[in-house]
């Protein structure tokens, strides 16, 4: 005799309710750094535009740098037997990954951003 509760039983057939064709399918959202790249570009060069291809390249670049910094910071935390990536690991990762003057500017801008964030809390 089959169990009376519906647990563990699979029913054949389609689920009841409105058919899928009636509903409008929503597109999956694509996340990107596009709006931020655009804002920074307008601060530096207010009269310049950017093509969608150039924006795609810049987005790939930002994603690549982000992944490299995250991987290096993770490695540094692991070497020091820490389970948390702090601003110190990120700063060291930036110093290791970026060359000379670019690293100095990135560290100073990062420090400025962290200070601004902590004071606004």
Curated annotation (Swiss-Prot):
Glycosylation site positions: 108
PROSITE patterns in the cross-refs: HISTONE_H2B
Modification N,N-dimethylproline occurs at: 2
Post-translational note: Monoubiquitination of Lys-116 gives a specific tag for epigenetic transcriptional activation and is also prerequisite for histone H3 'Lys-4' and 'Lys-79' methylation.
Gene3D superfamilies given in the database record: Histone, subunit A (1.10.20.10)
Annotated spans, Disordered: 1-30
Function summary: Core component of nucleosome. Nucleosomes wrap and compact DNA into chromatin, limiting DNA accessibility to the cellular machineries which require DNA as a template. Histones thereby play a central role in transcription regulation, DNA repair, DNA replication and chromosomal stability. DNA accessibility is regulated via a complex set of post-translational modifications of histones, also called histone code, and nucleosome remodeling.
Subunit structure: The nucleosome is a histone octamer containing two molecules each of H2A, H2B, H3 and H4 assembled in one H3-H4 heterotetramer and two H2A-H2B heterodimers. The octamer wraps approximately 147 bp of DNA.
Protein family: Belongs to the histone H2B family.
Protein name: Histone H2B, sperm
Organism: Marthasterias glacialis
């Amino acid at each position: 005799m089959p169990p009376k509760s519906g647990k563990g039983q699979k029913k054949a057939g389609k689920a009841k309710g409105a058919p899928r064709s009636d509903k409008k399918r929503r597109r999956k959202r694509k996340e990107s750094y596009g709006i931020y790249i655009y804002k920074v570009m307008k601060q530096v060069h207010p009269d310049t535009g950017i093509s969608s291809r150039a924006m795609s390249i810049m987005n790939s670049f930002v994603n690549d740098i982000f992944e490299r910094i995250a991987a290096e910071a993770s490695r540094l935390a692991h070497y020091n037997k820490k389970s948390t990536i702090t601003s110190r690991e990120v700063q060291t990762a930036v110093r290791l990954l970026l060359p000379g003057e670019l690293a100095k500017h990135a560290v100073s801008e990062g420090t400025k951003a962290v200070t601004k964030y902590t004071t606004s809390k």
